[in-house]
């Protein structure tokens, strides 16, 4: 799968109803990884308050790279999620934006990455992250695909949030005694 039509078809087949959000996000993350042959791992970082966490991942490299950023409090996935900007790292060995993180990521085999913000209503709630063990392999087409996946992640989270609101309202309504 290397074009937008194939990506959209794969994402449209993701079933949202009657599933846990984590399962849906894991499936979307796997689709992202397959859509971009140059990447070896993908993850979704969500940020609640100032606390980041990996909501889904496909490939241990992604989880390891995410954790390295969380330990430091900065890095491309966290900055994408906070600043609503795309961050592409062509080569961790020479990137100077996050020198401590980049050095440790390279030591763990991550040589390039892409982090795309997750838009949700009027905010950014995290990032879609992709990682590769080779430098300079993520191109503009990968950025385009990642932005599309990020939009689908936002839809899944929006649907889960709405379903949670509806369920809470049903519980609240059921708790009110009938006045008949």
Residue ranges of predicted features:
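Allosteric cytosolic regulatory segments
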Residues: 143, 147-154
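Short hydrophobic beta-strand micro-motif common in sensory/regulatory domains
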Residues: 112-119
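Short hydrophobic/aromatic beta-strand element in the GNAT-like acyltransferase core
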Residues: 41, 102, 115, 127
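Short beta-strand-to-loop transition segments that serve as allosteric relay/switch motifs
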Residues: 127-136, 141
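Signal-transducing coiled-coil/dimerization helices and immediately adjacent hinge/linker segments
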Residues: 162-180
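Regulatory sensory and allosteric helical modules in signal-transduction proteins
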Residues: 55-56, 62-111
